[in-house]
Amino acid sequence: MAREYPLDRYRNIGIMAHIDAGKTTTTERILFYTGAIHRMGEVHEGNTTTDWMVQERERGITITSAAISAFWARHDQRYRVNIIDTPGHVDFTIEVERSLRVLDGAITVFDAVNGVEPQSETVWRQADKYKVPRICFINKMDRVGADFEMSVGTIREKLGARAVRMQLPLGAEDKHRGVIDLLKMKALVFQDSEQGSHYEESDIPEEFKEAADAARAELLEAAAEQDDALTEKFLEGVELTEDEVRGAIRKGCLGLKLFPVFCGSAFRHKGVQPLLDAVVDYLPSPLEVPPIHGKTPNGEDAVRETRDDAPFSALAFKIMNDPAFQSQTLTFLRVYSGKLEAGTAVWNSVKGKRERISRLVQMRADKKDEITECYAGDICAVVGLKLAGTGDTLCDDKQPIILERMDFPEPVIDIAIEPKSTADQDKILQSLQRLAMEDPSFRVRTNEETGQTLIAGMGELHLEIIVDRLLREFKVDANIGKPQVAYRETVTTQVEMEGKYIRQTGGRGQYGHIWLRVAPNEPGKGFSFENKVTGGVVSKEFVDAVKAGCAEAMQNGPVAGYPMVDVKVEAFDGSMHDVDSSEIAFKIAGSLAFKDAVRMATPVLLEPIMNCEIVTPDDFMGDVIGDLNGRRGKVQGMTPRPGRVQAIQAQVPLAAMFGYSTDLRSRSQGRATYTMQFSHYAPAPKTALNR
């Protein structure tokens, strides 16, 4: 079967924002206007297409990133748009990270009342990291307090982004009727009676003309700056054509020089079709993003062009267990080069294993369309892969490549979980392992001292969802402990240590001997290991076993048994025996040397520090700041908001934030709100060990 749509008519986009900015509603409207669905769901009714999990519908939030294919007609052509609706809650930031890794462009949705909010800042920085071109949608222009210019100002000031207005709102709050198109210089008025399916173009009303002329002049200047020939025309006073402006803005957007801004109200069915036009006009096709880079198994640089006839390569960016396929694993892939066919075998270059692709599906949230092939530049899901994990590369075994893997943050909070009966013991461990495969920011470990199973995640809501899924999907009966801080440990000085494991039992013995240099690593770098053994005194395979022993020993630190982070290890000397040396002997020797070294390297306990933003009326500001100081918080700054409200930015230890929402409500008569996300780990006070 040949490719249905040429690659230049593909758009792989994400929809991202702060929680409650209207991402899922915007996605729902896009699906309706593209004909992918025939009835619009609403978040408050719990029946949207992309929020298909029970937990999402009950809470009215997006938890997982849902992938959907839709089609849009533009310039007399049909375009295929693969859309991923991502979560806005900070506990599910990892879902955004996974999606951005495989997207070509994004729509960032902002609330017209609040502008840039903490999580919109986080996802914007994540998109910067992956160099994803973006268009902006100022949503909720119908809300009381909606302010388009303020919102654009926050994009420019808080994000340092060059926001270029492509539209102005045609009225705001209850007078919001549509948008002013600054390219065509026309007013687009949306009909309330037809769910916004049609809009009329008309002349710009007199009261908006002056503002529209000024905004258009700014748009033309931004367009002219993207192209020398246009700059010359612009300076000579020659009118730029619509196509010239559109092409120049596209060039600036793809080069991350500027970010086109649109507006509307998704809930009131206004402004969504022009936003879809903008996806086609300003966001890249897979052909317009740089070729994907990776390494060969030998460590040499490798590149894959986005071509159907190139060697096959794809990245597994999401794993989920799907009841519709008898609970088989569903693996989401971004195909970067070549093509994938159902029934063929692929090579997992990270695991070094071959697996067969039994079935391919194209996703429509929780509905699946069976397909036989998936081509370069597309996103699809594979049924039944047993070995692939998030971030693994699937490729052609004759021309293997390992694509850059994803980094996942350390969990900050954990809870103990115990089966209610021995029958549930194995079931609970299997279920937790399957959930950990789906979500790399969720970890499972056993406390060696107590034997308790601990599950760790990015926040209370994250773990609440995990527990809820255990009980409902996997039918596990368990006792759940109270949330606790996920402390970590590290070393603060450098130590050299010898590790020996020698056993003689009459037959073949065991001999492992290694010297390690253990030192602090850069914050956030995790565990790193370097082989500096020279002269062949210890072979590479035995040094690899030493590395495995060290990595295993990292799971239980010397201070209080918490996992260790940010430790750098160098193997620099040792010896081996011609007969008795084995990988297991060197693994044990490495583990012994590491444990002795970290005990001597002045180990410390680390606690998670959170970035908090508290939005409070002026009247309660003194009380709120005093309370933060009492929680060992450090105020970083304050930003005035409209209506005698202040946004306080602070860094506070997570240990001091349990129960904070209840305290804040009582201090502010229920009028203050806060958001919190992980910042970094820092040394904990000695009193933390006594808790």
Swiss-Prot record:
It is found in: Cytoplasm. Its main location: cytoplasm. It holds the Pfam family EFG_III. SUPFAM superfamilies: EF-G C-terminal domain-like, P-loop containing nucleoside triphosphate hydrolases, Ribosomal protein S5 domain 2-like, Translation proteins. GO terms for molecular function: GTP binding; GTPase activity; translation elongation factor activity. InterPro entries: EF-G-like_DII (IPR053905), EFG_II (IPR041095), EFG_III (IPR009022), EFG_III/V (IPR035647), EFG_IV (IPR047872), EFG_V (IPR035649), EFG_V-like (IPR000640), G_TR_CS (IPR031157). Keywords: Cytoplasm, Elongation factor, GTP-binding, Nucleotide-binding, Protein biosynthesis. GTP binds at residues 17-24, 85-89, 139-142. SMART domains: EFG_C, EFG_IV. The keyword Kinase does not apply. It comes from the Bacteria. Residues 8-287 form the tr-type G domain. The keyword Ubl conjugation does not apply. Belongs to the TRAFAC class translation factor GTPase superfamily. Classic translation factor GTPase family. EF-G/EF-2 subfamily. This is Elongation factor G 2. It comes from Myxococcus xanthus (strain DK1622). The lineage of its organism: Bacteria, Pseudomonadati, Myxococcota, Myxococcia, Myxococcales. The gene is fusA2.
